[in-house]
Amino acid sequence: MKFNAFEEKLQQDLHQYLLSMNEVDNHMPECPDVEERWEQIAQTYLPDGIREFNDYPTASLGWMMYIGMAVAKYWDAELLTADANNRSLTDNIYAYMRDKRGYDHMDEYIREEVLLLKGNEYTALEKLTGECASRVYNILRHQNIEPGSKEAFRAYVACLHQLYLTGMAVQLKRMGYHMEKMS
């Protein structure tokens, strides 16, 4: 399996879906401060995500989209800087969020306490994230990868990576950052 092509397929599917929902711009954003946190977040997330994947695959995948949104929100609020007051947030952002209510309720914590959503916005984001996770899971399942193999692990990480970047893109647009050509 060509992982770059697989990851690109995930990215294109998510982008087209979110574009149709007006949740992202034509051009996906770049935000190096958020993107550079991916590796550390993935390393800490993987033990939890892998453990949950067999029983709750869309939650295991979807939580990463919420994490991408939360990191973008923290970035916008300038809470990711080295001189930020909260060292536990800057040192291990995933563990910080997970430990607030536990892995199972991290989605609710992010929607309520980080993104400050209520009512229809809260429910709409839950549906949007669920649909994105389901789309990614569907693509993954159709790859004919042997479960538990090195290839399966790499594919799972690719799925998480695209959902993280997608979460970042959705949140950046929601906060008013638009990726459009300057005239």
Task: Please give the residue ranges for each predicted region.
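Intrinsic-disorder/low-complexity detector
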Residues: 1-183
